[in-house]
Amino acid sequence: MQKRYTITPEFIKFSDINKDDFILSSSLYEKVNFKNTNGIFLKELLSCSLSNEFKGSDVGSDNYVDQSPYTFLRTKALQDFNYLPDFNKESLLRIKPSSFKEMNLKKGDLILSKDSNIGEITILDDDYPKMMISSAMYKLPIEKDKYYIFAFIKHSAFREQLDLLVPKGATIRHAKTLFLGCSIIFPKKNREKIIDYIETLVKSVIKKEKLIKIKHEKILHSIENEIASNQKDEVFTFSQPTISELKKKNRLDTNLYGSYFKEINFKIKNYKYGYSTLKELGYELSRGQNLQISNIGRSIYSKRYRSNFYELMLPKFLSKYGTVNKVEYLGNSNKLKILKKGELIFGAEGFEKGRSIVIIDEKEKVITNIHGITIRKKREQNLKQAIFIKCFLDFLRSKGVIDLFAVGGNGGSLAQKYWDEIYFPNLSEIVQDTVSNLYHNPEAHYNKEFDMATFYQIDEEFNSKAGIYELDKSMKLIKNKIDEVIDAIVQDNDPQLTFDFLKTI
């Protein structure tokens, strides 16, 4: 975590050293420096005391099962790049009904992590009567200014306070209830107006995150329905692999011979409008840039934007929705392998392989690393077709097909030799348009003047048109604006409460 408000004193009093048992570690004397002292401890903002009824409970791995309506939420669901919980096979586990503890989780509840990723927080977008949280989390009983407090806890001003309060552990850190001693800084002037502005923006982000999930599901359902409703007369029958099939794949340790894979593959090949491979569609595959010193020499890495640096879009930073959770920057004097508009990055390795993204805007210096496969059209780029390819790969990933191709340990990798066995249905232009617009709609813009009174309506109009790409882009701009306003509050400056920043979309 890059510290913005933490300072180390140039000198200390002997009495301070004596009080701390003569420990001379500089970190022990660090403190946060907020120009605005109008803060209230988090514990004073709770609607009631934080008793054990608000703390989660552990169930033990013996209670994990494959099928159950009851679920167990772990701290991995709380991520700094999301407002809503990130549900996946590692963060949300199914458990035996007998181990379930009722926690009455409701829409709008704030869930904060006290262990591991300490201080991370999420807000629930729905009621979850059959979900419980782990003992590493608390449900915060907050009613007044809930969304403002949520935004402040997400901000580095809160995290830096907590970092100084929590002992530095060797591996996992435990905050217990020390987070209650952190201050939430409030505006000195125009308090209600500023809080209303931030809460309006927070609610907009929550709406957009939810819509991204909904539109991604629509993409998957559209593809599945199109294939299922346009089958030829042939009927699938499973057969064991032949000798020639075994020789062709040269593998015995694979599920590609199983009925599950063969049935999915059959439906694609049985699509009445035909199918094609990537090569037949005019695309080629290549590995991303090798960033090792032996290949490109020394580089400078930065988490912040720097002019003339390459934008580093790594597969591990991609979400399953085709967005980027974060980027880093790399300075290097060599001419590296850049990505152009209409090209894809596909994460081919690890337990989360199969995540991908399309480069929508023309950018000067975007690169990925060798763990990513780049998919590019040999001739003129076709953005709509590239988006369909990305969305169909998402569909295969959602069905577990990408994992079935994997070779090797630690999640395995999708070797390039297997891409000739991945078939893409020849969807009509109309269907491709429908799928493509759910991911990227170039007609979605904030092209009206608006203020606090009209923002909600105009934001709703934008959201209804926007694809996943536009929702994510606007969401990131709004999050940056929220951080900018909170920073101004902490520094005791007058924040600019405008919406002009959205006109770039």
What positions do the PLM features span?
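A short beta-sheet element
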Residues: 74, 113-153, 336, 345-392
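Short, contiguous, well-structured surface segments enriched in hydrophobic/aromatic residues
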Residues: 45, 69-74, 307-312
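Well-ordered mid-protein domain cores that form the structural environment of catalytic cofactors
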Residues: 78, 96-99, 103, 111-121, ...
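Sequence-specific dsDNA recognition surfaces
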Residues: 39-61, 76-107, 279-300, 314-341
